[in-house]
Regions:
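Internal gly/pro-rich beta-alpha loop/helix module
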Residues: 138-230, 238
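A glycine- and small-aliphatic-rich helix-loop capping segment at beta-alpha/alpha-beta transitions
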Residues: 60-69, 86-89, 109, 136-147, ...
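N-terminal glycine-/serine-/threonine-rich phosphate-binding loop
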Residues: 1-46, 55-65, 98-117, 259-264, ...
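Short beta-strand segments
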Residues: 48-50, 73-76, 123-127, 188-194, ...
């Protein structure tokens, strides 16, 4: 089953290759640019690409637009694919913003300031855009932004809640990019890394009206007991609200979601069927603590093995979404590694199953692993490697535990980013 899981992963990642997703929606002929169902005859065409898939997305845009492209800016994570000319490329930090992220925001604002009536701005957004583009308000600064970002990531807040905060301490997020691009027409192609594929959440809503408010930000701080830096508190008290639905800035805006979690999950399910497993695409909306998500999957596996409900083996349970980790210890890991380790512990000694959990960008948390691949024998292998799995969970040290059990998954930078992918294969009845 481990080999089957690796084949399923390869197929799922190929389905979300960013160049393919852009190419399906963008083309040009003569002076006309076609995006989805819309057609434009712009004076000039510029591209702003930001996110962990920005390199291949920009490359695909260059191929589609040809000489129609007037210029562009591409913001990438270090080690990721760079775009061709005429793009200016800036390498920025992720998951923590850095000086490159600040420089990228400055260059993006300069690009926006140069737009005129009759121009078309194509914005290519993928996961990671929020950190890669550090458009922090001038009264906050990078260091306090990094403190805020780190506190939110450690708190266990869901990505949508984190983005709610980011929008209100930024100059481009929360729809402000579109406001600054006026009077040009803005078309955004969005490779979604958020549950539900809502444009106002992708990249912290760079190109969408913001339905969240300053009061929502305060609720996030209270719910997760986050104490923001004083500069953030002062900024929020200044009532810096984002543009809302109905604002005139969005009259010349088109958002198109070109791919997301369902794309990879569906491809994984179909590949599983091809390999002889009846697939159940359970949900692409699973969020929350990785341990709780793992417990749900463990319960489903036990039910299938004991009662053949909701379907009999051989079968595949496929889910997507974005899990989080509440940091309690000082170890290494990420949500998918924590999911995999928790699942292995809960199903220890049970045969006839194998599971894969990965971050589709190839980097789970701040580690070099994409996630984990575990079976009923993984916990025993971890112990043989000298690591106590329960203690590793207490210390949030899933990386080293899975490493000890030879259960880490490495893909390298995949070039895409469409949330988490989890696949559990079940081959037959359990035996202890």
């Amino acid at each position: 089953m481990e080999r089957d899981l690796k084949e399923i992963l390869d197929t799922a990642l190929a389905a979300a290759e960013p160049g393919k997703t852009v190419g399906r929606f963008l083309s040009a002929e003569g002076g006309r640019v076609m995006v989805g169902d819309e057609s434009f005859e712009p004076e000039r065409v510029f591209v702003l690409a930001v996110g962990k898939a920005s390199g291949p997305m920009a490359r695909a845009a260059r191929e589609a637009l040809g000489e129609t492209l007037s210029g562009g800016l591409c913001v990438i994570k270090g080690g990721h694919e760079e775009p061709p000319q005429p793009f200016e490329t800036i390498v920025a930090g992720h998951p923590e913003p850095d000086e490159g992220s600040v420089r990228a925001a400055e260059r993006a604002q300069k690009l926006l300031e140069g737009l005129e009536e009759g121009d078309l701005l194509l914005v290519l957004v993928s996961g990671g855009a929020s950190a890669l583009l550090a458009d922090v308000a001038s009264d906050i600064g990078l260091e306090d932004l990094k403190k805020l970002n780190g506190a939110l990531l450690r708190s266990g807040a869901e990505i949508g809640e984190i983005n709610t905060v980011r929008k209100h301490v930024s100059t481009l997020k929360g729809g402000n990019l579109v406001r600054r691009a006026a009077p040009a027409h803005v078309v955004a192609l969005l490779l979604s890394d958020v549950v539900g594929d809502e444009p106002s959440s992708i990249g912290s809503g760079l190109t969408a009206p913001d339905p969240t408010t300053l009061e929502d930000v305060r609720r996030v701080f209270e719910r997760y007991e986050v104490a923001p830096p004083q500069s953030v508190t002062d900024h929020l008290q200044g009532a810096h609200e984002t543009p809302k639905p109905g604002h005139e800035a969005f009259e010349k805006l088109t958002n198109i979601v070109v791919g997301g979690s369902r794309l990879t999950a569906s491809a994984a399910a179909e590949k599983a069927r091809e390999l002889g497993y009846e697939p159940l695409l359970l949900s692409t909306y699973l969020t929350g603590d990785a341990r709780h998500v793992a417990s749900l999957h463990a319960a489903v596996v036990k039910e299938i093995l004991e009662s053949e409900n909701p379907l009999p083996p051989p079968c595949a349970v496929v889910t997507g979404g974005e899990a989080t980790v509440v940091v309690r210890g000082e170890g290494m890991g990420g949500p998918n590694q924590e999911f995999a380790l928790t699942l292995a512990v809960e199903l220890e000694g049970i045969e006839s199953w194998a599971a894969l959990a990965v971050d589709t960008d190839g980097a789970d948390g701040s580690t070099d692993a994409a996630g984990g691949l575990v079976t009923g024998e993984t916990v025993a292998a971890i112990r043989e490697g000298g690591v106590d799995p329960a203690r590793a969970l207490d210390e949030n040290d899933s990386y080293n535990a899975l490493k000890a059990g030879d259960a880490l998954v490495f893909t390298g930078a995949t070039g895409t980013n469409v949330n988490d992918l989890r696949v559990v294969l079940i081959s037959g009845e359990a035996r202890r």
